Design a protein with these regions (language model features):
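Membrane-integral, polyisoprenol-dependent glycosyltransferases
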Residues: 2-200
Length: 200
């Protein structure tokens, strides 16, 4: 059972959250999509919204089979929610980055303590590649979030459980990861600890 955060722990967590938002959201809405991938991804999502065809991504009049549709669905939903492609095209990556940080913090807090959670999330936030990708309209932040969520759910079940809802959620996240990118098999690797535990 988790103990409530002390006032100093709560302040530290809020400082980390504010820093994460400041770092990841800096410049949000102030730029247009940058070549090579961002304009293409936004165009595919925009075409989904305009045509109503959400199953088969298209670029112009051509089918766009290069990537699975899940990320384009997120971009399209963000565009519908904000009404502005300039404000929406970075939203899935921003939310995925913040979600990944929260999952890392919460899992470390549950396994050890709040201090470990703060250090773990800080360690992720200072990785240049993480920040770089979270500030771009790329599929990778979404894949990282889904992979982290898959591991989070499975580890909550295996190490802190039984927690079958979290296990099912982790498996579902692994499945979404599979349809998010061409190398989507990576989230399925999250199932290896469970298979190992069952085999033992």
């Amino acid at each position: 059972m988790l103990t409530p955060l002390t006032p100093s722990e709560r302040r530290a967590a809020l400082w980390l959250a504010a820093t994460a938002v400041l770092v990841l959201a800096a410049g949000f809405g102030l730029r247009d999509p940058w070549p090579a991938d961002e304009p293409r991804f936004v165009l595919v999502a925009k075409q989904m919204v305009e045509s109503g065809d959400w199953l088969f991504p298209q670029r112009g009049s051509e089918l766009y089979p290069d990537k699975p549709p899940f990320y384009f669905w997120l971009l399209a939903l963000a565009g519908l929610a904000t009404g502005s492609w300039r404000w929406s095209f970075l939203l899935p990556s921003l939310l995925a980055g913040l979600g990944t940080l929260w999952l890392v913090f919460d899992l470390a807090r549950r396994l050890w303590d709040v201090r470990a959670g703060l250090w773990a999330a800080t360690a992720v936030l200072v990785v240049p590649a993480f920040v770089y990708q979270a500030k771009r309209a790329q599929i990778d932040p979404t894949l990282v979030f889904l992979t982290t969520l898959a591991l989070y759910g499975i580890l909550r079940h295996l190490l802190l459980g039984p927690a079958w809802r979290w296990f099912a959620g982790g498996c579902f996240a692994a499945g979404l990861g599979v349809i998010s990118k061409g190398v989507g098999f990576l989230p399925l690797l999250a199932l290896l600890p469970f298979a190992w535990m069952r085999w033992r």
